[in-house]
């Protein structure tokens, strides 16, 4: 549902943020 979509978007953003820091 909507909550799952929000969690997926948040996880994607967090992963991208961490990847940006590490690289």
From Swiss-Prot:
Localized where? Secreted
Describe tissue expression: Expressed by the skin dorsal glands.
Keywords for the protein's UniProt record, in alphabetical order: Amphibian defense peptide, Secreted
The GO biological-process annotations, alphabetized, read as: defense response
Main location group: secreted
Top-rank taxon? Eukaryota
One term under GO cellular component? extracellular region
Function in brief: Has no antimicrobial activity.
Q: Name it.
A: Dahlein-4.3
Q: Which organism is it from?
A: Ranoidea dahlii
> Which taxonomic lineage is given here?
Eukaryota, Metazoa, Chordata, Craniata, Vertebrata
């Amino acid at each position: 549902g909507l909550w799952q979509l929000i969690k997926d978007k948040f996880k994607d953003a967090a992963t991208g943020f961490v990847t940006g820091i590490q690289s």
